[in-house]
Every structure is written in C-alpha cells, then in structure tokens.
C-alpha cells in the first residue's frame, strides 16, 4: 500500500527529491501542483518529466481516500464518509459560516477516550491516521468547491472529528504545518483550532511548539466527580492536573483557551454547575472562553438527552453574571447524521446487517 504524497511536509518532499537525483525546484513545482493547482494525479503535472512522474507513481499515491457517502444539509453543511485504503471509515464535515468555510477533520479511526455521551467512541480506536490521510480530507473538501466552479476555499479548520488529536500528536502537528504552509493551502494558524479531551502533558508540549494555532478543551463538567463519570480521561488527568497544564499554556503562549461544554439535560446543565464552572475558570477568565454545545442525541447513549432551551439560558445567564465569556454554539446539519461519529456508526451498522442478511440467505 503506497503512502500518500500528502504525508510529506514541504521540507520532506524537497529532501526526497534531492535523494532521488532531482533539483530542489522540482519539489517546489510538485508542491505547487498539489496544493495550488490541486491535481488528483501525477500525470496532470505537465512540467514534470515522465521519468520523474513514474518515480512518483512508484513511491506514492496522491489522495488515499475514497468517497463513500455525502450528506448535504438544508443549511449548507456537508458531511462526508471516506474510506481509507485498508477499508476503515472516517468522517469529515464542511460547515458554512458567515466568516468562511470551516472543515472538521478526523484524526483516528475510532476513539479510546470513552466519553459516555459521544458517538465517536462507539467504535474503539483501530489506528491513528497519518498526516497524509488527515490532509487528504481537506483536499477532497476543496475539490468539492473546485468541481462546482465555485471560487471558494477552505478557510478554517477544526481538529474536532473522530479521535483524540493529542493521542496522535506527531501526525497532527505535521498536518497543521502542512495546511499552514504559506506556499500551499496557506490556511492561517489563527483560523485553525485543535481540540483535546484533556491530555495535560500534551497540552504542555503543544504550548512549547511556538505555533499560533488555537486550543480548545472538551471540559463538559465543572468537578472531578461528574467529569470522571462521563469522561473516563478525567481519571488519568483530573481537573487539578488539567488546569495546571492550561495555565502553563496560557502563560507560555498568551493565547486564549476555549472550553467546550456539551449540555446534557439534568446531568451537567444546572445553575449550580454553572456557578462551579464560573469559579473553576475564574483564574484564567481574561484568556478563556466557554462554548455551550447543544447535544445531538445518540441512540446508543439514550441515558442522555438535549437540555431544554430554558436550562441552557439559565446556565448561560449564570456564566455571564460571573463575567465569563461564553456563547451557545450555532448548530449545523441537524437534518443529517449530525453527531460526530454518527454517520460512520450508522453506516457500519447497515454494512453489518447486510452481511448478516447475506449469510442468512
């Protein structure tokens, strides 16, 4: 199975070209074909020699993903189900915003974090995606625009799809540098957000990277007892350890942290929990932000339901009265398989049913 050429950073592509007897400018030309002209095959690179194209084909493919399903929402949201070369399935989402087009990418096949409300964790982690497989998601969404003759581009990226990005740290960092490269897609670092469930040691490492990429933390509860009951990760990285890492990140980067807080009816959405959350974030209030997220119900997690608007409003009011910067997140794609991991899970369920039916016949 040949790797995708997207898995190489620009420096790695230059090094590979030099090792294979080519000039540096040839690597620059290839990079330009990939990320500016966005070709889907090496044969389309008209200023590259046939011998070098043959060498490229021998060692690499271009895009390793196959499109299985596309769901388009009435609000313009597009959800993709992609198949990897080994047959594994991943999701990617395009969200149309007033400020541009944002793409949510997946970083792992399955997830081992074990959040009890999340569709992503219904399938345990099978493997990490490599840098090329993550980058390919962006390239196929951009291809969606290009094929429609739309003068539009992917302007924002959120690393919030299936999997824990910091559990696949090295590949995610290579991906971030690839899409941020000024000679390629040139997606601004401040238009990119990476979300973690709270791997404290990786937050510290991320703080030392010197990148301007935004950090979001999936918090979802304001105390250890509740957070440990709905997010297994809290048993390894309790709030004291997590917030020490967050404070280090803020001190090191002087950048704001966003806290994601999914609203679960009568679980974590009471006014007393809102006050706890306000107290928890008080020390870092000037450089923190709370994103209240309406819950997309998952049939396998029927113990949870969406918080009524009245409870969300009351929670929000407590935060605002305490001076917390917060917002209720705008929903996207509510008329399709909206929850992260839901399209993949539902498709795999249907595939299994087909196999069972075929065996029964």
Curated annotation (Swiss-Prot):
The residues that cross the membrane are none
Name used for this protein in its record? Probable dual-specificity RNA methyltransferase RlmN
Q: What class of enzyme is it?
A: transferase
Q: What is its biological role?
A: Specifically methylates position 2 of adenine 2503 in 23S rRNA and position 2 of adenine 37 in tRNAs.
**Would you say which domain of life the source belongs to?**
Bacteria
Keywords of this entry: 4Fe-4S, Cytoplasm, Disulfide bond, Iron, Iron-sulfur, Metal-binding, Methyltransferase, rRNA processing, S-adenosyl-L-methionine, Transferase, tRNA processing
List the catalytic activities from the record: adenosine(2503) in 23S rRNA + 2 reduced [2Fe-2S]-[ferredoxin] + 2 S-adenosyl-L-methionine = 2-methyladenosine(2503) in 23S rRNA + 5'-deoxyadenosine + L-methionine + 2 oxidized [2Fe-2S]-[ferredoxin] + S-adenosyl-L-homocysteine; adenosine(37) in tRNA + 2 reduced [2Fe-2S]-[ferredoxin] + 2 S-adenosyl-L-methionine = 2-methyladenosine(37) in tRNA + 5'-deoxyadenosine + L-methionine + 2 oxidized [2Fe-2S]-[ferredoxin] + S-adenosyl-L-homocysteine
Q: What is its EC number?
A: 2.1.1.192
For this chain, the annotated S-S bridges are 104-340
Q: Where does [4Fe-4S] cluster bind?
A: 111, 115, 118
